[in-house]
A protein has these predicted regions:
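Class I S-adenosyl-L-methionine-dependent methyltransferase catalytic core
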Residues: 1-161
C-alpha cells in the first residue's frame, strides 16, 4: 500500500503509545493515557472534520467484541484505512455483518497468542491484525476478503442449528 508522506494517523486507544514511535504524524487519544504524547479523550465522543485518517490501534474488545465494533464503526466515519488488532471473532460473519459495509477487508495476519503482556508477564489472547480499506478510496486495490454473506448452516450430512 502506497501511503502519502503527509497522511495523519489516528490512534484512538493509544494507552502507553506503543505505535506512536512508528508514526510520523498522528493524533493519539486514550481515556487513561500513559504517555504525554497522548490526549486524554474518550474516542467514542471524539469529533473531527477530518475524514481521511489512517486509523491504527488495538481497541478495547469489550463483551462479544462490542467495544471493538464501536471503535471500528467510529473510525469508519473519519478514515480511509483502519488497521486494528482485534479478537479473532472479527473473522466471523457474526461480527463482520456489524461493521461499516463501505470497508473491504484488505489483509489480515493472525498474531501469536502470547503477543501481549500484562504486568510484565505474557498474556495469552487470540487476536488478528486486520487492514480494512474504504471502498473507492485511493487505497482501494479491489481486494475484499470480507465475508459478504452468512455461511451455510446446513449440509446434506448434518445441520448446524
Amino acid at each position: 500500500m502506497d501511503i502519502p508522506e503527509d497522511v495523519i494517523y489516528l490512534e484512538p486507544s493509544a494507552g502507553g503509545g506503543s505505535f506512536l514511535d512508528l508514526l510520523p504524524r498522528y493524533v493519539a487519544l486514550d481515556i487513561a493515557p500513559e504517555d504525554e504524547r497522548i490526549e486524554k479523550q474518550d474516542y467514542l465522543k471524539y469529533e473531527t472534520e477530518k475524514t481521511d485518517f489512517i486509523t491504527i490501534g488495538n481497541p478495547p474488545f469489550g463483551k462479544r467484541s462490542k467495544l471493538a465494533i464501536d471503535f471500528f464503526n467510529k473510525a469508519a466515519k473519519m478514515s480511509d484505512v483502519i488497521a486494528f488488532i482485534v479478537p479473532v471473532s472479527f473473522m466471523k460473519w457474526s461480527v463482520q455483518k456489524n461493521l461499516d459495509f463501505n470497508f473491504a477487508l484488505n489483509s489480515y495476519t493472525y498474531l501469536e497468542p502470547e503477543s501481549f503482556s500484562s504486568n510484565g508477564e505474557p498474556y495469552s489472547v487470540r487476536t488478528v491484525f486486520q487492514v480494512w480499506v474504504k471502498k473507492g478510496s485511493q487505497y482501494d486495490n479491489g481486494i475484499n476478503l470480507r465475508l459478504t454473506k452468512q455461511p451455510p448452516i446446513s449440509h446434506p450430512d448434518f445441520e448446524i442449528w
